[in-house]
Every structure is written in C-alpha cells, then in structure tokens.
Regions:
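Non-catalytic macromolecular-recognition regions in eukaryotic signaling proteins
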Residues: 2-121, 127-308
Length: 308
C-alpha cells in the first residue's frame, strides 16, 4: 500500500513537472520579440486637440504600454492619455491606446493652409524605453470645411453595417461620392442610397411620439428591415442620385480574406451634392469603421506575416 502511494506521488510530481515544462515551451513558442502595431487607415479632423486610437498586440505576461507616437515629417508627438482597453487572449493581449496632441495657434494656422496632413512613418516609444520605427499605415488629418446635411440618425454595428439618415429641407442631387482613402478601401466598402423611405420618414418623426411602446415598435421594425438591404461598390452606384424628404446612406464593410483583415479602418466617404437652387454642398459619413477581432490563431497568422 505504501509503495502504491509512493508511486502515485512520484507520477503526480512527474505530471506536474511535465505540465510546467509544456507550459513554458508553449509560452516561448508563442512569444513575440516586440509589440506588433497594426496598420491604421484613419481620417480625423483638424482641431486644437486631436485624439488617435492605436491598436497593438503584446505578449500577455509582459506589461508594456505605448507612451508616445512621434511623426517626424511634421514634428508631431501624440502622448498617452492614460486610457488603454485590453482584450486578454491565452498568449497575447490585444490593446487599444488613446493618444492626444494639443496644437498651439501657430501650428493650427500652419496646418490649416495645407490640404491634408498625411501621417505614415512613426516612432513609437513604450513605457519600458523600447522604441520602434514603423509604417503606421495612413492617418489623414484634414481641415475640410463642409456645408453639410442635417443628420437625424447615425448607427453602426459590429458586423460592419452602418447607416446614416438625413432629413432634407429641399430635394438634392448626389453628384459624386469620394474618399481620401478610396484606393485603400474601395474593394471592401459597399453602399446603398435610399430616398423617401417610409421607415426612414417615420424615424425622422419618432421624436414626436410620446408612447414608449410605439417608439420601441417603430425602432424594432426599423432595425429588422436593415437585414434586407443590399449594398454595392461605390463606383457601381447610379449617380447622380436625386433625394427628397429623407436620404439614408447604408454602408457595409465587407472585409476580404487577405492582409487587410489585420488593419484598422476609420474612414470617411463624402457626399457631394447640389440642391434645387444650385447650391453645392458636401457631407462626410463618419461611422464607417472596422477593426479585427483577434484570437490567438489570428495573432499567430499576423506574427507569421510580420516575420517575428
């Protein structure tokens, strides 16, 4: 009996040691030599303060955070706002850091004279002193002055679908739809334009309702209807497009199964319009976003792609 207990104890110790060794090996196999900053394709507006959300991957067992991002072309430095969202996986952390810059008056005047500020090459500094020189993708800071439409609703979902509804005082004609990140996104951004839709018209007037049950019924009916909307590549839309009463722009981010799926997108497509009096206007859509939902497997694919 004592011998059996001794054997069981020995086997238990061996099993624990083997499990520990296997765990250490797994950690080493999945370890990345440095943080992986995703490519970002973003468009933000020029203000005295500008925020950037940056996504990056780190080893799970190492506490490392972005302190700052420096863009040497324009001598701009964004600093950490002490906000970080972390999604913990088995071997990695998928992080989102928010960084901020405050521009002085001279900088604002200088940049307002430029059509666009395009940020690509970046130097990232971490809280452990590590520095990385990377191509961050393409971040566009613009100072466009828009004469826009009146938006009554804007929404987006985790599936990549988004919708914006505009209430129109007069009929308008949409002549063109453009984006400063068109070349980077036109293969997977699709749209549909709808005018004077009964549900959209009802939604515009929903604030006049006082019956909460009635409001919920209208909203449920409205959102269920979105499942049947088919979107098309922007260059296949029938333009010019005339709209009256309401204009809804439906957008679907249909990500391709290629390297783009590892990138982050927060882009703007701009509607260029003319009203019935011949006045020209432009209105950007602000809810077209995509960011990858990482699993350990997807991170390993990205690590292999980056050669780390």
């Amino acid at each position: 009996m004592k011998k059996n207990k001794k054997k069981i104890l020995i086997f238990g110790v061996i099993a624990c040691i083997f499990s520990l060794i296997l765990n250490i090996v797994n950690i080493q196999v999945h370890k990345i030599s440095e943080p992986i900053v995703l490519e970002h394709y973003l468009e933000v507006s020029l203000h005295d303060e500008i925020d950037l959300s940056i996504n990056y991957i780190t080893n799970k067992r190492y506490s490392i955070k972005i302190n700052s991002i420096y863009f040497p072309k324009y001598d701009l430095t964004f600093y950490d706002k002490n906000f970080q969202d972390t999604n913990s996986l088995k071997y990695y952390n998928s992080n989102t850091a928010v960084l901020n810059i405050r521009l002085n008056l001279d900088q604002q005047k200088e940049y307002e004279e430029m059509d666009n500020i395009i940020l690509e090459d970046a130097v990232i500094t971490y809280n452990n002193g590590l520095e990385q020189n990377i191509d961050i993708g393409k971040i566009i800071i613009n100072n466009n002055k828009e004469k826009g439409l009146r938006s009554t609703m804007s929404s987006s979902s985790s599936t990549g679908f988004s919708k914006t509804v505009f209430e129109l005082d007069n009929s308008i004609i949409i002549n063109d739809i453009t984006s400063k990140l068109y070349e980077e996104t036109h293969n997977f951004v699709k749209m549909n334009l709808v005018t004077n839709d009964e549900l959209d018209n009802t939604l515009v007037n929903i604030s006049k309702e006082t019956d909460k049950d009635k409001i919920m019924e209208i909203e449920d009916n409205y959102h269920n209807n979105q499942k049947d909307i088919e979107c098309y590549p922007v260059d296949e839309l029938q333009l010019p497009f005339q709209a009256y009463n309401t204009l809804s722009v439906n957008t679907n981010f249909e990500m391709l199964d290629n390297d783009c799926k590892y990138n982050v997108y927060d882009i703007r497509y701009t509607l260029h319009s003319t009203d019935e009096n011949g006045n020209e206007g432009s209105q950007s859509l602000y809810n077209i976003r995509y960011s990858p939902y990482f699993t350990d497997k997807l991170v390993r694919q990205l690590v292999k792609k980056r050669g780390l």
